[in-house]
């Protein structure tokens, strides 16, 4: 794993979060390098700057290294990004008092003179971010967005024009480009919330823009709902909850149980919380955590059932470490006799991991693409 970041005289040691000693993934990419290199070569002044979608703090650490008092307004939807940025500032002995933190639902300040962004995979979420910027940025404010060259096309530039202002792309460097957008000073309204029904379970669901499977029930969740375990469950964790549909259904099936919703995405947790209220479930039975798996779950929460549909992406990276951490956390936090009940793509071979961790694994259901697996803590 490469940890030494070096661009235009800026030297840093950067780690992903959580740290993975055996991983070949690094905490930054060439788009981070390109964006920081462009700023240094243009001798950018230390003006109030928003940094958006900075995976593990490469951009904020780089600017703090250049000017320790650079006023930075860091926006992220991912708890691991927040924790990783903190970790890397500490590792490089950089100040933190020049940073202010924002989620993707918070309103950024109106005194911004520059915005730096990484292009997210989810373009609906990106459009939401640009729309929010249109509501606070004065005309002529520069927004610099770094991305892989293959991700940049006329359709993407049209998204800029529709939601913020005209944009153009730089020349390529290490297969990346930096898009420069100039705010036109015209505030745009946020997209209206869309609510959709799952009639067979008498549920109404809505998703914020960065939540997986917007406006429909994804196939993995559907097969999971059709194969939920039976038992006398009192404490249930919906781990990686997304919009919360699994936890909502278990609240219907086990009305005496406390349901704990956990996700790395703040928008996911907010969506689950809104859906809990929308479906008029008991306010004292739903609990919501923006967290890196179960790292900071209160000590008194000892679930007897953990439901999990693990992601196998972290940003642009394809990785199984999130699933591995979810399974480890489940084994650590489950009561004796408690159950981990998961859904996954067949090709991911999660049964091997569960057998290794729990010394048991049962196939509950499967189809051509997905498999439901269950392991018990003994």
From Swiss-Prot:
It comes from the Bacteria. Pfam families: MTS. It is found in: Cytoplasm. This is Ribosomal RNA large subunit methyltransferase G. Its main location: cytoplasm. InterPro entries: DNA_methylase_N6_adenine_CS (IPR002052), rRNA_m2G-MeTrfase_RlmG (IPR017237), RsmC/RlmG (IPR046977), SAM-dependent_MTases_sf (IPR029063), Small_mtfrase_dom (IPR007848). Keywords: Cytoplasm, Methyltransferase, rRNA processing, S-adenosyl-L-methionine, Transferase. Specifically methylates the guanine in position 1835 (m2G1835) of 23S rRNA. GO terms for cellular component: cytoplasm. It catalyses: guanosine(1835) in 23S rRNA + S-adenosyl-L-methionine = N(2)-methylguanosine(1835) in 23S rRNA + S-adenosyl-L-homocysteine + H(+). Disulfide bonds: none annotated. One of its GO terms (molecular function) is nucleic acid binding. The keyword rRNA processing applies. Its EC number is 2.1.1.174. Belongs to the methyltransferase superfamily. RlmG family.
């Amino acid at each position: 794993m490469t940890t030494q970041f070096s661009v235009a005289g800026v030297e840093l040691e950067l780690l992903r979060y959580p740290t993975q000693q055996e991983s070949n993934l690094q905490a930054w990419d060439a788009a981070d390098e390109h964006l920081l290199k462009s700023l240094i070569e243009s001798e950018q002044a230390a003006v109030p700057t928003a940094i958006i979608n900075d995976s593990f703090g490469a951009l904020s650490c780089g600017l703090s290294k250049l000017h320790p008092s650079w006023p930075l307004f860091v926006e992220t939807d991912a708890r691991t990004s927040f924790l990783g940025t903190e970790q890397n500032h500490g590792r490089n002995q950089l100040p933190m008092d020049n940073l202010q933190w924002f989620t993707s639902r918070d309103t950024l300040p109106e005194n911004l003179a520059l915005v730096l962004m990484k292009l997210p995979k989810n373009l609906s979420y990106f459009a939401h971010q640009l729309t929010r910027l249109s509501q606070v940025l004065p005309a002529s404010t520069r927004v610099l967005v770094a991305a892989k060259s293959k991700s940049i096309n006329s359709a993407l530039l049209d998204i800029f024009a529709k939601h913020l202002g005209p944009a153009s792309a730089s020349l390529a460097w290490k297969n990346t480009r930096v898009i420069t957008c100039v705010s036109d000073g015209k505030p745009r309204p946020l997209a209206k919330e869309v609510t959709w029904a799952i009639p067979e379970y008498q549920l109404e669901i809505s998703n914020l823009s960065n939540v997986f499977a917007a406006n429909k029930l994804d196939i993995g969740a559907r097969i999971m709902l059709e194969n939920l375990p039976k038992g006398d469950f009192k404490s249930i964790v919906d781990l990686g909850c997304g919009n919360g549909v699994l936890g909502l259904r278990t609240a219907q099936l086990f009305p005496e149980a406390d349901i704990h919703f956990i996700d790395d995405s703040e928008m996911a947790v907010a969506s689950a919380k809104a859906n809990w209220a929308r479906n008029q479930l008991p306010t004292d039975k739903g609990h919501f955590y923006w967290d890196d798996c179960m790292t900071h779950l209160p000590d008194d929460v000892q679930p007897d059932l953990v439901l999990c549909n693990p992601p196998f992406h972290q940003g642009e990276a394809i990785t199984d470490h999130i699933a591995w951490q979810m399974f480890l956390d489940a084994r650590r936090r489950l009561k004796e006799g408690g159950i981990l009940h998961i859904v996954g793509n067949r090709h991911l071979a999660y049964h091997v991991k569960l057998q290794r961790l729990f010394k048991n694994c049962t196939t509950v259901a499967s189809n051509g693409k997905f498999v439901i697996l269950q392991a018990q803590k003994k």
